[in-house]
Amino acid sequence: MTTPKIQLAGVTKSFDGKQVLRGIDVAVEAQESLCIIGTSGCGKSVSLKCLLGLIVADGGSIKIDGQEILGANRKKLEATRRRFGMTFQFGALFDSLPIWQNVTFRLVQSQKMSRDDARQIARDTITQLGLAPNVIDQYPAELSGGMQKRVALARAIADKPEILLFDEPTS
């Protein structure tokens, strides 16, 4: 049997005494897709944030390729996060940055690439998602909500992550 790419076992999380996650058990194999559906406030976003180590689960186990990340040190969490691309429930674009910088923010921070290389990656990724190449010089407020969602998706895939997570992908 192969080790799951992602495995959550018995994951729990509470906020102010209210339990949001109660013993979540999920295993996702490589090349497999999983969709978690539930009512508003049931813990879908919290599960993803625990998986990324953005918030710490109260208990259970969270593994990526068999490596425990729950309780991992900052360096290990950062290395794990680099393997993921994610779109958040709310676009989370930087209003003060042009689209090309929004798309390549993580790439530039982690790989110290040139401005020209970053702009080209942004242009290629934006075009791949059906937006006009000239969009890269605009700012988020100049785009429709749907276009902003595509920019958030472009940012998630620009550095070709190993694992993609989408919070509210149908919105």
Task: Provide a role label for each language-model segment.
Residues 69-85, 115-116:
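ABC ATPase NBD coupling module
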Residues 160:
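Conserved catalytic motifs of ABC-family nucleotide-binding domains
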Residues 67-68, 115-134:
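Conserved ABC ATPase "signature" region
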Residues 52:
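Helix-to-loop junction immediately C-terminal to a conserved catalytic motif
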Residues 96-105:
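Short coil-to-helix segment of the ABC ATPase nucleotide-binding domain corresponding to the Q-loop/switch region
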Residues 139-143, 147:
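Conserved ABC ATPase signature
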Residues 164-167:
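Catalytic Walker B motif of ABC-type/P-loop ATPase nucleotide-binding domains
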